[in-house]
Amino acid sequence: MKWRVNTTPDAFTHSTVDPCRFGALNSEVIFSSLELDVGSCLVDAGCGPGEYSVLAARLIGETGSVIALDRDPWMIEQLRQTIAAQAITNIHCQVADLGAPLPLRDQQADAVMISAVLHMPGLTDRWQILFSELQRGLRKGGKLAIIEKSNASAPADHPLHLRLSPETIAANVTPHGFEQCGLVELRADKFLILFEKY
C-alpha cells in the first residue's frame, strides 16, 4: 500500500534543536515513518556530522543503538566530538564507504535512513552494492527511508543534474528485496521515499 503525506510548514524548523542538513527538516516526521521506538537499531548511512544520529539516539534510548556511517573521516570525527561532549553512549560511528561491503551484521538493524547522499558523485554507479548491503543488514519488515531533493526545481545550491526522482530511486531499490510503502513530501523541493524489506 502506498500513502502520501503533505506536511505543513510546522513540519520543519530552523532552530538548533533540530539542525538537519536539508534546512532543518523535522526529525519527528522522518522517525515516525521509520517507526523508531525505544530499543530500535537505526543505521544512519551517510550520517555527515550526525545531526539525525544524535536526535535518534535520544528517541531510542539506552536500550537502542544508532550505527552512524560516513566515508568522510572529518565528519565522523565531528560526530565523535558531539558524542563525547553530550555523553551519548548509544551511537557507534565508523568511517565506511557506502559503495562497498558495510560493517553490519545480517539483519542487525530495524531501520535505515539515507539523507542527501544518493546523488553524490562516486556513489551513483554503486547503488546496487549499497542497496544489497542494506537489505542484508536490515531485518525482515524493517524500513528504509531515503531523503533527497526533488528534481522538480533547481535552485542554484543544488544543480538539476544531481537531483533524483522518487521513481528513479524506487526502480533501483525494489529489485533488492524492498517494497515501496510511502512517499512523503517534506517540502516543495524535498521528499522522503520509504521502503519495507520483505
Descriptions of predicted regions:
Residues 128-140:
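A short glycine-rich, Lys/Arg-flanked "PGG" loop and its adjoining helix->strand segment in the class I
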Residues 43, 49-100:
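Class I SAM-dependent methyltransferase SAM/SAH-binding core
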Residues 141-148:
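Conserved beta-strand signature within the Rossmann-like core of class I S-adenosyl-L-methionine
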Residues 99-112:
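A short acidic, Gly/Pro-enriched loop at the edge of an enzyme's catalytic core
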Residues 157-176, 180:
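Conserved Class I S-adenosyl-L-methionine
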Residues 6-25:
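Class I SAM-dependent methyltransferase Rossmann-like catalytic core
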Residues 21-40:
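Conserved alpha-helix/loop element of class I SAM-dependent methyltransferases that forms part
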Residues 182-198:
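Core SAM-dependent methyltransferase catalytic element
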